C-alpha cells in the first residue's frame, strides 16, 4: 500500500469554506496552522499503522520551513518518499511572481508550463538537495509529461490524472462530480507521448513515465 498525499498549505477550498465573509488572505496564520495540522495527522495515522507515505510537496509547502523539516524527518525516520506535486500553486509567492490567480497547470501556455515546472523543480532541489522521482497534478497533458521526462529524467512516475479531471478539464468549470468517469485510467498505465490518457501502443509511443 502506498499512501500518497500532500501538505496543502493553501487548500483550494479554503477561501470558500473557512474564509466566508473575510477579506481574502491566503497567507493567514490560521489557514497555515490548519493545513499543517491536517498533514501531521495524516502522517501520524499512516506511521501508527505501519504504512509508508509518499509526500507530494506543493509549491506553497516548499516555502514553509516546518513542512520541509517534517518531510525530511519522516524521509529519514520512516523511509517516506519526498515527491513533488504541481498542485498547491496559488500561494502568495506564486501570485506575485506570475501575476495571476490561475493555478491549473494544464491551462497555461507551454512556455509558462516550462517556466513553472523549472521554478517548482528548482525550488524543490534547493530545499532537499535532490530532484523528485515522482510528481503529479489533477491533470498532466502529454506536452507537460514529455517536457518533465526530458528535463528531469529521474522522474519515474506521475499521478497524471484525477478521477474527475478528463477531457473536460479544459473547460475549467468542472465544479461538480457528475463527470465521475471522465478522468483517466483507474490503474497504472504507460501514457502515450501524444495523449496522456491513452496508453502507449508500443515502445515508440512510451512517454517514459
Q: Predicted segment positions?
A:
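Extracellular structured ligand-interaction cores
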Residues: 2, 52, 79-81, 132, ...
Amino acid at each position: 500500500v502506498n499512501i500518497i498525499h500532500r501538505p496543502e498549505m493553501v487548500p483550494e477550498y479554503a477561501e470558500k469554506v473557512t474564509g466566508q465573509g473575510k477579506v481574502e488572505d491566503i497567507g493567514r496564520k490560521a489557514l497555515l496552522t490548519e493545513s499543517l495540522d491536517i498533514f501531521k495527522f495524516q502522517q501520524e495515522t499512516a506511521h501508527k499503522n505501519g504504512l509508508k507515505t509518499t509526500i507530494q510537496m506543493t509549491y506553497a509547502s516548499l516555502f514553509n520551513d516546518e513542512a520541509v523539516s517534517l518531510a525530511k524527518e519522516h524521509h529519514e525516520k520512516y523511509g517516506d518518499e519526498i515527491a513533488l506535486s504541481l498542485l498547491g500553486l496559488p500561494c502568495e509567492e506564486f501570485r506575485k511572481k506570475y501575476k495571476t490567480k490561475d493555478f491549473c497547470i494544464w491551462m497555461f501556455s507551454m512556455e509558462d508550463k516550462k517556466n513553472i515546472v523549472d521554478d517548482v523543480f528548482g525550488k524543490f532541489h534547493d530545499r532537499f538537495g535532490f530532484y523528485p522521482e515522482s510528481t503529479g497534478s489533477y491533470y498532466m497533458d502529454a506536452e507537460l509529461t514529455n517536457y518533465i521526462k526530458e528535463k528531469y529524467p529521474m522522474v519515474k512516475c506521475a499521478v497524471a490524472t484525477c478521477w474527475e479531471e478528463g477531457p473536460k478539464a479544459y473547460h475549467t468549470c468542472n465544479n461538480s462530480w457528475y463527470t465521475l468517469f471522465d478522468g483517466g485510467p483507474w490503474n497504472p498505465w504507460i501514457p502515450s507521448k501524444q495523449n496522456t490518457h491513452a496508453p502507449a501502443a508500443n515502445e515508440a509511443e512510451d512517454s517514459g513515465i
